[in-house]
From Swiss-Prot:
UniProt keywords, alphabetically: Lyase, Membrane, Transmembrane, Transmembrane helix, Virulence
Gene Ontology MF: a single term: gamma-glutamylcyclotransferase activity
Protein's UniProt name: Gamma-glutamyl cyclotransferase gliK
Protein family: Belongs to the class-I pyridoxal-phosphate-dependent aminotransferase family.
Source species of the chain: Aspergillus fumigatus (strain ATCC MYA-4609 / CBS 101355 / FGSC A1100 / Af293)
InterPro entries in the record: G-Glutamylcylcotransferase (IPR017939)
Signal peptide coordinates: none
Disulfide bonds: none
EC code(s) of this entry: 4.3.2.9
Length: 273
C-alpha cells in the first residue's frame, strides 16, 4: 500500500507508534500533541530495523513488517545459528489531529523511506493483556524499501524505545524483548574512531541539507516530491555502497551485529488478524 489518504479534517487519526515516538517527549519535541493515548498490540506485524540510517552513528531505524501466512518468523543474530520466535509488535496508539499527523509524516522523512499502512490494534489492559472487545484501526509507517538483514540500531535509539515501553505499564513486559536486542556500539580503537569520524564528516552535511529540503517541500499530506525522494534514496544508496565496499575494508564496519528476521514453513501457525 502506498500513502494513505488523511481522514476528515474535523476528525482524529489514530497513529501507531513503535519506535522512538514511544517516548512522548520525542513526539512533543516535534511540536505534536496527542489527544488520546492507548497501549496496544498489533498481532499482524512485528518490529524490525530495516530502515537504513547512517553508518558509525545511527545504522538503522525501526519499522514493522507483516507476519507471513502459514510461516513462522524467527530472529537470528549475527553468525549465530540459534534463533528465537518473534513476538507481535506492541506500542502506543496516539490520537492526532490532521495537522499534527501531517507534521509527524514530515518528521519521519516525508514519505521517502516509509509507506503509510493501516493496522488493526488491540488495546492492552494494565497487565499487558489484549482486550478482544477493544480494538482500533490505526495508521502506521512501514518500510518502503526493507533492508535485509537489518543493521543493529544504536544504543541511544534502542534506549528510547525501551524507555518508552517502561514508562507505560502495559508495555513493561514487551520492554524485556527490546532490551534483549543487540545495539550498535561505536568503535573504541583510535584507528576505528578516526575512520568513523572521517566518514561522518563527509556524508552528514549533504544528508542534513536534504532533510531541510524535505521540511520545506511537502504536499498537503506531508509527502515530499518524487524527484527529491529519488535524490535522497540515491545518496543513501551511494553512501552505503561506499561503506560496504571501500570504507569498511579500511576502517572497520559501522553497522554492528546483523539482525536476521527469517520465515520458515510451519505446520501449524496461529492465524493472525
Amino acid at each position: 500500500m502506498g500513502k494513505a489518504a488523511l481522514q476528515d479534517p474535523h476528525g482524529g487519526i489514530w497513529y501507531f507508534a513503535y519506535g522512538s515516538n514511544l517516548r512522548l517527549s520525542v513526539l512533543e519535541n516535534r511540536g505534536i500533541k496527542a489527544l488520546d493515548i492507548k497501549a496496544v498490540i498489533v498481532p499482524s506485524h512485528y518490529l524490525t530495523f530495516d530502515i537504513f540510517g547512517i553508518p558509525y552513528a545511527e545504522p538503522s531505524f525501526a519499522s514493522v513488517a507483516p507476519f507471513a501466512r502459514e510461516k513462522k518468523t524467527t530472529l537470528r543474530l549475527g553468525d549465530s545459528p540459534a534463533s528465537r520466535d518473534v513476538p507481535p509488535v506492541q506500542g502506543l496508539a496516539y490520537l492526532l489531529n490532521p495537522r499534527d499527523y501531517r507534521q509527524l509524516v514530515i518528521s519521519e522523512g516525508g514519505g521517502v523511506a516509509y509507506d503509510e499502512v493501516e493496522v488493526h490494534a488491540s488495546i492492552l489492559d494494565k497487565d499487558g493483556k489484549p482486550d478482544p472487545g477493544a480494538t482500533l484501526i490505526a495508521r502506521t509507517l512501514q518500510a518502503k524499501y526493507p533492508w535485509r538483514p537489518n543493521g543493529a540500531p544504536s544504543a541511544r535509539y534502542l534506549g528510547l524505545i525501551s524507555t518508552g515501553c517502561k514508562q507505560n505499564e502495559p508495555l513493561t513486559a514487551y520492554s524485556d524483548y527490546i532490551d534483549s536486542l543487540p545495539a550498535y556500539e561505536p568503535p573504541t580503537s583510535l584507528h576505528a574512531k578516526v575512520g568513523g569520524l572521517l566518514f561522518l564528516m563527509f556524508w552528514r552535511p549533504p544528508l542534513r541539507l536534504l532533510i531541510r529540503l524535505i521540511r520545506v517541500n511537502t504536499d498537503q499530506d506531508g509527502h515530499c516530491p518524487q524527484w527529491l525522494g529519488w535524490i535522497i534514496l540515491t545518496l543513501y544508496g551511494l553512501m552505503w555502497s561506499y561503506h560496504d565496499n571501500i570504507h569498511s575494508k579500511i576502517w572497520g564496519r559501522g553497522d554492528g551485529r546483523k539482525l536476521h528476521f527469517e520465515e520458515t514453513p510451519a505446520k501449524e501457525v496461529p492465524v493472525r488478524h
